[in-house]
């Protein structure tokens, strides 16, 4: 499968045919014989076997059904297991038992052993002839084996010497099972589509020979819902041309299934469809020709060689082997022409009626259809253009064989009167119809058996049935009339154009290498130069040929030099026009030039407005590639497929192509402006839409602010981390002035940036807070609106009104649900600005009796004289014992969140539900003669301590006992003495001194620490000024008596005693203190024993207590 096939490369009286499985064979019409070898190159073309570089000319390597390798000599039509050069067996056959015949010639008795449509198997009798001595073990494959065609070891071996047209990723649907889509790496080369597991292209997973396939987008009946999907449908040559009869419907072999592919983008899909159609149409629009002595049979319907044989796919060197039911004379269908003529006459009337009834528009241009039908001497339009038989006119038409033998003719234009257009036309129309159904759902599209819809005269139509020859290059006389304008893909065989391509500079090639078309173009040129230009025309270099090419270039509308038209490239058809009958003496491939008024469609782009032509094309095509319609002045040449024909582009065409692309841009803008609707548009239907839109806009504003704040915070954190490193370096290099100066300079710059970022962050935070307030307001409005709508919905009486209100409610719900995801993020961000988590706890000394500032203190309150502190101040808050208590909540030992000094005390709102009430004031003095009060038992919450495990409780008890004996702190806490008493000095100062320090401590001006662990912390509350006497809890630091040496001129208040270093203990003896402490410790031990006995019920008790009020006596809490 190496040599390229071209009609002009074949000698006279030679043509080629294609089997159903894509294999190509060549027909000598003069000798009535077939061969797998190209008559000029001597190499097989797509025969299903491998061509190796170490094999002589005409030799190929094949494989048996068992996998053994053998060699095929197409010259002698023999097979052998020995290498023709070395004479040795292949190393791959070491596991096989080979039996070589003395003269293994392809014999007729073994012709039925090979199944049809198996490209990967032998097309000759290689396997069967080598095993003739022992035919018993020979396994005859059934038709079910056909379904494994092209996979794994059955795949065609890829020739790495052939350039790759396209490669890339595609999704392919499995042929069986669950029909999953799998991603595969596809490579299009040598008219075959290979696919691999990945881009390394190591092992071929399968191969698909594209000739005789039709590639098109998926249709609705395919039931493929995947985007950008297309398919490769195998249809035999006769099925493309003649699909109405039973024989035609049987042409599609069961082994040739439909392949479904899916690309990632629309551009990729279009590129793959074009490239695969190029490879598929190389061999699918071919037909076989007859020579001069059978010219009278030219107008008769004849099918392909493969159709006359029921085995079809194997007309070749082993032709007689594959067709046992026929003799040599009827192997090509000549003896059946009389029967076919009768069948053709019987088919004329129904086909004619069907043509008259079809009113659907053809996807081809009228000029293109002219080229399709007028050029076919034996095809349907050939009969239509020539209603009477040539014999009736007295002069038989010229046969193709006669024209091929006429040396006076030179090719000056692509042949338009070739029977091979039947197949290509049917392929293109079927492709266009599938595309039209899928894209537009056009109900006027005809089924596949009516894929030639066109309004025309009621002339007889015929479909060739049994023999389709591929004519060689035909030539027009210099004085012959030119065919009408057309865009039909045909051959491109002009020495002038190829020479002008050689003049292209590398810059020009690079400048226009912008798509798949130009990639195919460059690939064709590389292959052409690499393989020695196998597609050179016969009349190349002839002066007459050059003149004819130039003269035709002035009369024809150019077509793209790249690819045949795809469904998206097909312009709309023009009005119907009758075809004039051919003149009696007009050769088969001469066509009549039509009057100027009948030539239109593609002429519009030249004589008329380009915008008008663009508008026509846009009606029936979603995308029209202007590269497929170059301007006037360039010959109408198309490339039938890659690697077969060279093509070129001169400087004039390149310049005109640029102009057309420029005009396309201008026309696109005008068309868009023209097509714009002038009807006004309403965005909002009701006030609900407006409110929801504003609400969503506010959410977007918050999102933007959140992103800005997030970015600023990241920058701030980075700068702070760098500055922290610089601070450490400053301390480290303190004794190095030079280095320290550099660090200081860098530090100063970063500090300026930090200040700027912090200012920006503060501004954005303020804006975020304002936006959040607006957001909450809008949310409240929307909620009220929702409630109103719900109320209206309940009251609504009419169904239409209820339906409209329900729609509005759904809109509100959808918007609220969509915005709820970001709401919590905004709340946390704004809350972190208002109430930061960590508040500063100062470590510097604080006045023992802090006071309010003059602006914040009440006029009646007087500041107390401060005293020097000796330790960190403790938070002390006043709270009447008779007031309502908040349930106690245990907290681990931690610093209390205090308010910043910058905040006003008026902003400090009490939060009774979050904090415990403040402690009442401490007493000043009491009489030692007084009976000490009885210590009440600990409340239930005393069981909730830091350590909840049994081991931790026991260890805590031991530590407290040891600390008590040593006079140390209990668990790191100072000893706390609790006493309930009536303090006259304190009561006297309720209206004066006492509330002031309490307020100053409670307010935001003071910085303080909490009592660690078990202290009851509460929200700010003012001591209610009352003349009643109420008991209070005394909180005293347990200090030794010997430390109390300082004396006071007046009694100290509770706060002064707390923050002063010396307390007077003269009123209580040491024995009384020890006795009191013992009672207290005994109560603690009893409670802990009770906790140890309860075990894991502690959590339940604490949960139960949280729902109960605090006991009346707080004196047991330490």
From Swiss-Prot:
Q: Does the keyword ATP-binding apply?
A: no
Could you tell me which residues carry Phosphothreonine? 867
Tissue specificity, in the record's words, reads: Expressed in kidney and lung (at protein level).
Lineage runs: Eukaryota, Metazoa, Chordata, Craniata, Vertebrata
Which cell locations does it reside in?
Cell junction, Adherens junction; Cytoplasm, Cytoskeleton, Microtubule organizing center, Centrosome
Where along the chain is composition biased (Basic and acidic residues)? 100-113, 334-355, 434-443, 494-512, 586-602, 955-966
Positions of region (Interaction with CTNND1): 535-693
Please give the residue positions where the record annotates the modification Phosphoserine: 533, 542, 566, 601, 605, 609, 857, 864, 868, 900, 904, 983
Q: Which GO terms describe its biological process?
A: cell-cell adhesion mediated by cadherin; epithelial cell-cell adhesion; pore complex assembly; vasodilation; zonula adherens maintenance
Name the segments for region: Disordered: 100-145, 334-512, 528-629, 839-873, 886-968, 1003-1024
Compositionally biased region (Polar residues) = 114-131, 452-481
Parts forming coiled coils: 697-798, 1064-1091
- SMART domains, per this entry? PH, WW
Q: What is this protein called?
A: Pleckstrin homology domain-containing family A member 7
Q: Which GO terms describe its cellular component?
A: cell-cell junction; centrosome; cytosol; nucleoplasm; pore complex; zonula adherens
Q: How does it assemble?
A: Interacts with CAMSAP3 and CTNND1. Interacts (via WW domains) with TSPAN33 (via cytoplasmic domain) and with PDZD11; the interaction with TSPAN33 is dependent on PDZD11 being bound to PLEKHA7 and facilitates the docking of ADAM10 to zonula adherens through interaction of TSPAN33 with ADAM10.
| Entry GO MF terms | delta-catenin binding
* Organism of origin: Mus musculus
The WW domain covers 8-41, 53-86
Which residue spans traverse the membrane? none
């Amino acid at each position: 499968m190496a040599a390229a096939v071209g009609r002009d490369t074949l000698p006279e009286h030679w043509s080629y045919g294609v089997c159903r499985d894509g294999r190509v064979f060549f027909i000598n019409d003069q000798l009535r014989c077939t061969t797998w070898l190209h008559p000029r190159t001597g190499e097989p073309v797509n025969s299903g076997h491998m061509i190796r570089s170490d094999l002589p000319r005409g030799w190929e390597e094949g494989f048996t059904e068992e996998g053994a390798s053998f060699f095929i000599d197409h010259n002698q039509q023999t097979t052998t297991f020995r290498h023709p050069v070395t004479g040795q067996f292949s190393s791959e056959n070491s596991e096989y038992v080979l039996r070589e015949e003395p003269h293994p010639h392809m014999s007729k008795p073994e012709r039925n052993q090979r199944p049809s449509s198996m490209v990967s198997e032998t097309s000759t009798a290689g396997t069967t002839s080598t095993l003739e001595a022992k035919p018993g073990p020979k396994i005859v494959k059934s038709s079910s084996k056909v379904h494994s065609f092209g996979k794994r070891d059955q795949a065609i071996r890829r020739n790495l010497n052939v350039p790759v047209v396209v490669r890339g990723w595609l999704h392919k649907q499995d042929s069986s099972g669950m029909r999953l889509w799998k991603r595969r790496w596809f490579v299009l080369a040598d008219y075959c589509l290979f696919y691999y597991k990945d881009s390394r292209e190591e092992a071929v997973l399968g191969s698909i020979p594209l000739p005789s396939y039709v590639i098109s987008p998926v249709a609705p009946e395919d039931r493929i819902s995947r985007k950008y999907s297309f398919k490769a449908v195998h249809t035999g040559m006769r099925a493309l041309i003649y699909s109405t009869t039973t024989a035609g419907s049987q042409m599609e072999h069961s082994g040739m299934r439909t392949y479904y592919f899916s690309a990632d983008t629309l551009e990729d899909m279009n590129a793959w469809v074009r490239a695969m159609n190029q490879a598929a149409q190389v061999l699918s629009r071919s037909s076989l020709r007859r020579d001069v002595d059978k010219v009278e049979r030219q107008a008769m319907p004849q099918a392909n060689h493969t159709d006359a044989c029921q085995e079809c796919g194997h007309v070749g060197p082993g032709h007689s082997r594959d067709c046992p039911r026929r003799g040599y004379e009827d192997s090509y269908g000549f003896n059946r022409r009389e029967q076919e003529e009768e069948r053709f006459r019987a088919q004329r009337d129904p086909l004619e009626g069907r043509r008259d009834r079809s009113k659907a528009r053809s996807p081809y241009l009228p000029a293109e259809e002219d080229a399709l039908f007028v050029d076919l001497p034996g095809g349907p339009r050939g009969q239509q253009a020539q209603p009477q038989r040539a014999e009736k006119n007295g002069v038989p038409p010229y046969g193709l064989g006669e024209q091929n033998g006429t040396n006076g003719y030179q090719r000056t234009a692509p042949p338009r009167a070739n029977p091979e257009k039947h197949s290509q036309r049917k392929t293109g129309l079927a492709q266009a119809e599938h595309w039209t159904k899928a894209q537009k759902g056009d109900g006027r599209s005809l089924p596949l058996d009516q894929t030639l819809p066109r309004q025309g005269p009621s002339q007889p139509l015929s479909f060739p049935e049994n023999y389709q020859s591929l004519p060689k290059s035909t030539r027009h006389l210099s004085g012959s009339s030119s065919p009408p304008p057309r865009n039909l893909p045909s051959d491109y065989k002009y020495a002038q154009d190829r020479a002008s391509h050689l003049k292209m500079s590398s810059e020009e090639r690079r400048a226009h290498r912008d798509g798949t078309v130009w990639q195919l173009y460059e690939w064709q040129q590389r292959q052409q130069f690499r393989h020695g230009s196998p597609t050179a025309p016969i009349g190349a270099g002839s002066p007459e040929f050059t003149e004819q090419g130039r003269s035709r270039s002035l009369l024809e509308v150019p077509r793209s030099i790249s690819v045949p038209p795809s469904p998206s490239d097909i312009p709309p058809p023009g009005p119907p026009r009758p075809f004039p009958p051919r003149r009696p003496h007009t050769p088969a491939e001469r066509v009549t030039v039509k009057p100027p008024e009948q030539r239109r469609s593609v002429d519009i782009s030249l004589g008329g407005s380009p915008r008008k032509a663009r508008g026509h094309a846009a009606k029936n095509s979603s995308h029209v590639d202007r590269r497929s319609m170059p301007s006037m002045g360039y010959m109408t040449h198309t490339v039938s497929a890659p690697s077969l024909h060279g093509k070129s582009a001169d400087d004039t065409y390149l310049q005109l192509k640029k102009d057309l692309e420029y005009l396309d841009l201008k026309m696109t803008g005008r068309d868009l402006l023209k097509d714009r609707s002038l009807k006004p548009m309403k965005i909002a239907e009701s006030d609900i839409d407006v409110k929801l839109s504003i609400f969503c806009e506010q959410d977007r504003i918050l999102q933007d602010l959140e992103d800005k704040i997030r970015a600023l915070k990241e920058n701030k954190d980075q700068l702070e981390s760098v500055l922290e490193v610089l601070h450490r370096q400053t301390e480290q290099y303190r004794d190095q002035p030079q280095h320290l100066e550099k660090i200081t300079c860098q530090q100063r710059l970063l500090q300026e940036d930090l200040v700027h970022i912090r200012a920006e962050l503060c501004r954005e935070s303020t804006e975020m807070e304002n936006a959040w307030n607006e957001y909450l307001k809008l949310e409240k409005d929307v909620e009220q609106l929702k409630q109103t709508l719900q109320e209206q919905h309940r009251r609504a009486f009419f169904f239409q009104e209820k339906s409209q209100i329900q729609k509005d409610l759904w809109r509100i719900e959808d918007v609220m649900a969509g915005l709820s995801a970001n709401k919590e993020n905004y709340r946390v961000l704004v809350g972190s600005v208002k109430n930061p988590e960590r508040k500063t706890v100062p470590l510097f000394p604080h006045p023992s009796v802090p006071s309010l500032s003059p602006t914040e203190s009440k006029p009646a309150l007087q500041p107390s004289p401060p005293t020097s502190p000796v330790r960190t101040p403790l938070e002390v808050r006043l709270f009447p014992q008779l007031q309502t208590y908040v349930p106690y909540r245990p907290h681990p030992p931690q610093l209390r969140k205090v308010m910043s000094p910058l905040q006003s005390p008026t902003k400090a709102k009490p939060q009774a539900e979050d904090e415990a009430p403040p402690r009442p004031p401490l007493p000043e003095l009491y009489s030692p003669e007084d009976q000490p009060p009885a210590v009440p038992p600990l409340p239930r919450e005393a069981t909730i301590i830091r350590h909840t495990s049994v081991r931790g409780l026991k260890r805590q008890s031991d530590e407290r006992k040891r600390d008590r004996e040593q006079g140390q702190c209990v668990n790191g806490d100072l000893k706390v003495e609790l006493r309930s008493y009536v303090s006259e000095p304190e009561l006297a100062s309720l209206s004066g001194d006492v509330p002031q320090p309490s307020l100053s401590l409670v307010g935001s001006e003071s910085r303080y620490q909490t009592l660690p662990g078990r202290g009851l912390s509460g929200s700010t509350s003012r001591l209610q000024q009352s003349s009643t006497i109420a008991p209070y809890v005394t909180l005293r630091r347990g200090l030794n008596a010997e430390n109390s040496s300082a004396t006071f001129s007046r009694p100290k208040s509770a706060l002064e005693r707390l923050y002063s270093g010396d307390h007077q203990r003269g009123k209580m003896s040491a024995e009384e203190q020890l006795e009191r402490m013992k009672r207290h410790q005994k109560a603690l031990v009893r409670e802990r024993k009770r906790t140890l006995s309860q075990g894991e019920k502690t959590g339940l008790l604490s949960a139960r207590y949280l729902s109960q009020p605090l006991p009346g006596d707080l004196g047991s809490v330490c």
